[in-house]
UniProtKB/Swiss-Prot annotation:
Gene label: serS
Protein's name according to its UniProt entry: Serine--tRNA ligase
GO molecular function: ATP binding; serine-tRNA ligase activity
Cellular localization per UniProt: Cytoplasm
Family: Belongs to the class-II aminoacyl-tRNA synthetase family. Type-1 seryl-tRNA synthetase subfamily.
Assembly information from the UniProt record: Homodimer. The tRNA molecule binds across the dimer.
Binding site for ATP: R262, S263, E264, E349, I350, S351, S352
Amino acid sequence: MLDIKWIREHPEKLDEALAKRGIEPQAERLIKLDLERRSHVAKVQSAQERRNTASKKIGQALAVCDQKMAERFRAEVEEIKVFLSSATAEEKRLTESLENALSALPNIPLDDVPEGKDESDNVVLRHFSVPTTFDFTPKEHFDLGQNLKQMDFERASRLSGTRFTVLSGALARLERALGQFMLDVHVYEHGYTEVSVPLLVRDESVYGAAQLPKFADDLFRTTDGRWLISTAEVPLTNLVNNEILEISDLPLRFSSLTPCFRSEAGSAGRDTRGMLRQHQFWKVEMVSITTAEQSLIELERMTECAEDVLKRLDLPFRTMVLSTGDMGFAARKTYDIEVWLPGQGCYREISSCSVCGDFQGRRMNARYRKEGEKTLHFVHSLNGSGTAVGRCLIAVLENYQQADGSIIIPDVLQPYMRGMRCITA
C-alpha cells in the first residue's frame, strides 16, 4: 500500500509513476478522500474533548451541590455521545474508503525500470550459456514424458480436470529431486532459513502480500473462507505481520518448498498442452525482510541465488528487467529469469525476483526499529522463485533429451536419484 502522506506531499510524482503503468491520475481523488477523513477525525476529536471537559464539570458542579449545573452538563455529555455514536461509524466508513482506494493502486516503479506497455518492452540484462542444440529435432516435454509412460494427462484430467498432471516412476522422483536440490542450495549455501508453512491462509495474509483484493479471481478459496496459497511468498512474508523487529535481526531470509495453487483465470487458451501452466505445481520460494537501505542490494543477491540453481543444472537462461507494463502489482522492480526450452524453441519464465519496498510492510504493519531510535520504520520485502519446480523439470527434460527419447539426469541431481544417470521407458 502506498503512503498517503507521501501522496499529499508529492501528488505529481504519484500520477507520473502511475502513468508509467498505464493508469489514470489518482492523486487528486486520494487527497480529497484523505482531506474528508482528516476533517471528520478532527470533528470527532473536538467532540471527545468537549465530552471530557463536560464530564469533569459534572463532578465540579456536584462538589458544590449545584444539581442544576450538573444536569446541564450531563445533558451536554449525552448529546455529544449521540453525535459520537454516528460520527465514529462515519469515521470508519471514510477510513475504509481511503484504504480501499489505496489498496487498489499498484506500487511505484523505481526510476531505472524501463518504461513499456507489456513484455515486449522488457530488457535483456544478461545470458548464461547458449541455447542447447541437437543433431535431431528436439521434442517438447509432454511428448517426452508421455513416450516414457511417466507423464499422464488423461488420468489427471479424469481425476481433477484440465491443467493437472500425474507423474510416476523416475519422473516423479526427478521432480522431487529438483525441489530438494533447490531448497538445499538456498538453505545450506545461500543462507536462507527453511520454513514449513501452512498451505491455507486467512484474508489478512493474502491482503498483506498484496494479492487481495485485486487478484481474488486468480486464487482458490475454501468453503470456510481460507485461501489456498498461490505462492509461499504469502505465508513467508506474513511471518512478520504486525511485528516490531530490531534492525540487528535484519535481514531475515526465508525459503520454502510448497505446492502452489492458481486458478489461471486469465489464461484461457494459453499453454493448454503439457505442464507449463498448471492449477497445482511445486515451487521453491525465497523471501527477504530487510531495511530501506539494503533492499536493492538484497534484490541483486536474491536474483543471483536463483540464477545459481540454473547454473548448477547447466541450463541456458537469460535474465530480464521487466518493463513498467509487465511488472507485478506489488513490485518496484522485477528481474525475470527465462530458461531455454529447445522443444518450444524459445525462452520461458522460470523465476521472478522482485523488490517491493515498504508496500507489503505497510499492509502488514510490519516494522523495525533502528538502533538508538524510537521511530519505527516499515520493513522492506522481497520475493523470488528459487525456482518453479515444474518448469525446471520441463527444462531438464527438453535440454537433456537424447535422440532415443531417454533423459540424461544432470550430475547435481544424481545423488538425489540414488545414482540414476538416465531415465528410459
